[in-house]
């Protein structure tokens, strides 16, 4: 008779969870940030709000974003005037778009990740799908399983309405699944489309306007598993994870799904709350490793906006190049919510290899990935790079 202990040992992987492939995708419609204020106020019939338009222009100028990608183009918006209004009942129209488009964009990213991984998709044992764009039953996880032709027995996890910290959450969950299920290969997909949050301007809800200046669409996929086979190419090891709610941060970032779509509410002090608490998170993560010089590790941080990055950089005394990959993704794509940190992970490994830096983490061995979002919730993932 086999004991429970023997069964448990046989079920568990030997080594740490490893990111084995990354794929990204965006809608084809690219929006230039410098001309976006004119377009946005025209398409929402708000050109009479001249002072607010000037304010929005300043927001866009300060955003450090050059361009974004959006599923919503002029043609779609003209067909759906309720989406362009500030607070018109429009949830049905928004839902109809995103329940179709979120899985499709996710499929694009997942297909790229599976191609890089190089293994048959029948070897995928688990699927984690994450989106803040639309809710349906069966969910986007089911739709993606069908679109990709995954096995019907794939074990699915659907994460809705997590927001901007969830790029860290999916890695934490994937790590636990990979390490506790020997031979597991976890496909992780984050797919975000701003059709749920797009709306016209108003001078009574400026935090909504901040969202209109920052958010973009994108999907990212990674494949995670422990004990890589010789044919698999590890990129990063997932060594340690944590999630915490910051003290005195209730209401700092809120989102509410209503008849008018998803409304966002931001307190001005979000950058202050994050920068004030970031060192504690780093100490908890890196003290056991004997690391206290935060310029000696590579960094991936959710780029909620330039003020967050600036204040974290100042608080920790970081060299400007530490945030290079993060700032690059913000500049080229905007804030894509949960997908952002996976785009940055992809950018970092590509630039590290291009520049001959020796490891996937800018030539360094250890790194950290941060997700920030509603709560205010912080996700921390300690990464170990791979020699290239």
UniProtKB/Swiss-Prot annotation:
Record's function text: The primary product of this enzyme is 4,2',4',6'-tetrahydroxychalcone (also termed naringenin-chalcone or chalcone) which can under specific conditions spontaneously isomerize into naringenin.
Reaction(s) the record says it catalyses: (E)-4-coumaroyl-CoA + 3 malonyl-CoA + 3 H(+) = 2',4,4',6'-tetrahydroxychalcone + 3 CO2 + 4 CoA
InterPro entries, sorted: Chalcone/stilbene_synt_C, Chalcone/stilbene_synt_N, Chalcone/stilbene_synthase_AS, Polyketide_synthase_type-III, Thiolase-like
Pfam families: Chal_sti_synt_C, Chal_sti_synt_N
Family the entry assigns: Belongs to the thiolase-like superfamily. Chalcone/stilbene synthases family.
Protein known as: Chalcone synthase 2
Stored CDD domains: CHS_like
Protein's pathway: Secondary metabolite biosynthesis; flavonoid biosynthesis
Organism: Glycine max
Lineage of producing organism: Eukaryota, Viridiplantae, Streptophyta, Embryophyta, Tracheophyta
EC number of this enzyme: 2.3.1.74
Keyword annotations from UniProtKB, A to Z: Acyltransferase, Flavonoid biosynthesis, Transferase
